[in-house]
Amino acid sequence: RTRVMDPHLSVPPLACLPFSATGNCELQYMAGVTGLREVRYGLAGANHLKSTKDESNPYFTYDASKCIVCNRCVRACEETQGTFALTISGRGFESRVSPGQDQPFMDSECVSCGACVEACPTATLQEKTVIMLGQPEHSKITTCAYCGVGCAFKAEMKGNEVVRMVPWKDGKANECHACIKGRFAWGYATHKDRMTEPMIRKSIHDPWQVVSWDEAINYAASEFRRIQAKHGKDSIGGITSSRCTNEETYLVQKLVRAAFGNNNVDTCARVCHSPTGYGLGQTYGTSAGTQTFKSVEKADVILVIGANPSA
């Protein structure tokens, strides 16, 4: 095993052996497991040490000088994401991972799902947040708040600051994969424009005023009562966002029906999911998904609609 690792460590910079900036470098870890402390082949032959780092993607960098051409990223893009944005170009010492047709990542078909970054055993593909903030010190399992799919993530943190969001391997809804939003676009949680305190205003022309939660809730309740007294109980309704969890959506409809006394409740997810929701409801009695990815492996029959599995 040591001899197998030796050629791999002759490709990236030799500083990889003692280097710990990436924190999860599999190549470095396996070198330690096999007892490899120095390489025999050196850097006299062809290599990629003078390759220019691709920083075109806003979320991660691609440093070809650290690549061992293991093909993991290519397979992740093909087999996990299904985008086929990466390939191995060249032959022999000229072999390298190529986005598109030797293009920068942002000019290729890459959708920034992060599957290649997660699969990379070195620091060739690395999150920019890790480079800027350093290595995470602890983590916590959480759920993505972007939509109702419920993808599970491991929030890796340094103190109280999120360093990166990694798709959780045991996530029932995503199984260690995610889209660009959950994987990289979580900065809204700490964005300077995010409202962190309750605010009220008497009219649209008045400035917002920061108040306590009790004052905000009492003001909202009094205004709802005033509107219903003037325009009737059907004058108020509730619409939930597709970012809401099932529990939050349930509470909104309960508030509208129990407190406001009407059925004026809806969710924006109904518009795009109404056909599938109706079909599932008629067939299974519920409009929500009833299976996990694991259950597909045990299915006797799989019906695929609107796709070309042979492509």
Give residue ranges: language-model regions.
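Catalytic alpha/large subunits of respiratory electron-transfer oxidoreductases
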Residues: 13, 70, 131-311
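Fe-S ferredoxin-like electron-transfer domains
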Residues: 1-112, 117-143, 161
